[in-house]
Swiss-Prot record:
Pfam families: DUF1292. This is UPF0473 protein lp_2273. PANTHER family: UPF0473 PROTEIN CBO2561/CLC_2432, UPF0473 PROTEIN CBO2561_CLC_2432. Belongs to the UPF0473 family.
């Protein structure tokens, strides 16, 4: 899956799937993990309504790739556990995504 960052608003990116379909996503936040040596990006659909339950997606990314970098799938259960802990902490501190 590739990432194409919208130059007008750095909080929105377009993901292009293997079939060429484009979907807009808002960036919830990014963070780095020294333990796993990766940077992570957490996204949710740009068309999600404020009162909807939102499907948050997480990927590994390389911030040095710029606007057209490739997002990588998180394959390790240990990495997923860490990402979920970071997300839960973010949501608890932020009071949700409101």
């Amino acid at each position: 899956m590739s990432q194409n960052q919208d130059r007008k608003d750095n909080d929105v990116i377009t993901l292009v799937d293997d079939e060429g379909n484009e979907t807009l996503f808002n960036i919830l936040f990014t963070f780095d993990s020294e333990d796993f040596g990766h940077s992570y990006i957490l996204l949710y659909p740009a068309d999600a309504a404020a009162d909807d339950e939102v499907d948050i997606q997480a990927y590994i990314f390389n911030p040095e790739d710029g606007d057209n970098g490739e997002l990588q799938l998180i394959e390790s259960d240990d990495e997923w556990d860490m990402v979920e802990q970071v997300l839960n902490t973010f949501l608890a501190d932020d009071g949700g995504m409101q």
